[in-house]
């Protein structure tokens, strides 16, 4: 993806790039994925599935502005799923999966911002804090998910489903290493390299009634996150000249 706009800057002393001076942003994201699944049927009542998948991403950037850092990200996961169906009335399934992930984020220094802040009289500590659009991060993750479900169909008129599970999400590059103004929201966003995977629990149930062409369904859903990743305002002003303040 590329975004082109006539060169502009918040610093009068920043020269336009010699090559492609009007290329504001460019992202070259390459994704490679692979997966393998094997199904085993133990009997007429039991079915098992073993699976593996992996993915590698490489993001390269260019342009005179900055939005996302360069990074490479690799994930791999192994899963096992079992289904037990003794008859046409009852079906029980359960599965577990473990994932491992690694992300390496490249640092990005804004030398023109550093020069601007020095000219404005900010001390070395403040300059060092603000001049990095992204920090170097090397992070390993490991987490698991599981699910357990039941389907009960006592008759053609009634069906009951119940599911419970645990899920997770690995933090993205911006959540780990961002340090600058997000122009879509006009706020200074700062990542946290100590973040762990986001974890959540889900439970849902449903009851479906069919009677003489009438169908009635009730399906409550509950979700709870034990390590939810969210924006936490600090109440502090950003010193960046393009912070929209």
Language-model-derived ranges and their functions:
Residues 1-147, 151-153, 210, 217-220:
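Face-selective signature of the C-terminal outer-membrane beta-barrel domain
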Residues 11-13, 57-59, 101-102, 169-171, ...:
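A short local loop/turn or secondary-structure capping micro-motif enriched for an aromatic residue
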Residues 16, 62, 94, 106, ...:
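Residues in flexible loops and secondary-structure boundaries
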Residues 91, 159-162:
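Helix-centric, low-specificity signal for extended rod-like, repetitive segments
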Residues 123-153, 159, 166-225, 235-245:
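Outer-membrane beta-barrel signature, preferentially recognizing the C-terminal barrel domain
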Residues 229-231:
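Extracellular/periplasmic, surface-exposed regions of secreted and cell-surface proteins
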């Amino acid at each position: 993806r590329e975004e082109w706009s006539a060169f502009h800057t918040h610093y009068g002393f920043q020269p336009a790039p010699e090559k492609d001076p009007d290329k504001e942003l460019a992202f070259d994201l390459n994704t490679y994925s692979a997966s393998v699944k094997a199904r085993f049927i133990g009997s007429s009542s039991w079915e098992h599935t073993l699976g593996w998948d992996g993915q590698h991403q490489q993001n390269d950037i260019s342009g005179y502005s900055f939005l996302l850092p360069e990074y490479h990200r690799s994930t791999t996961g192994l899963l096992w799923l079992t289904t037990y169906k003794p008859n046409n009335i009852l079906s029980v399934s359960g599965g577990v999966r473990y994932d491992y992930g690694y992300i390496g984020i490249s640092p990005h220094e804004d030398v023109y911002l550093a020069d601007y802040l020095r000219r404005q009289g900010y001390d070395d500590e403040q300059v060092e804090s603000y001049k990095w659009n992204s920090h170097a991060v090397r992070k390993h993750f490991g987490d698991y998910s599981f699910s357990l479900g039941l389907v009960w169909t006592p008759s053609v008129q009634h069906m009951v489903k119940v599911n419970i599970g645990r899920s997770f999400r690995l933090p993205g590059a911006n959540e780990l290493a961002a340090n600058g103004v997000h122009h879509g929201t006009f706020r200074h966003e700062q990542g946290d390299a100590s973040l762990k995977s986001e974890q959540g629990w889900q439970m849902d149930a449903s009851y479906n009634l069919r009677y003489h062409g009438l169908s009635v369904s009730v399906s409550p859903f509950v979700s709870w996150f034990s390590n939810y990743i969210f924006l936490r305002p600090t109440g502090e002003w950003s010193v960046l000249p393009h912070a929209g303040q």
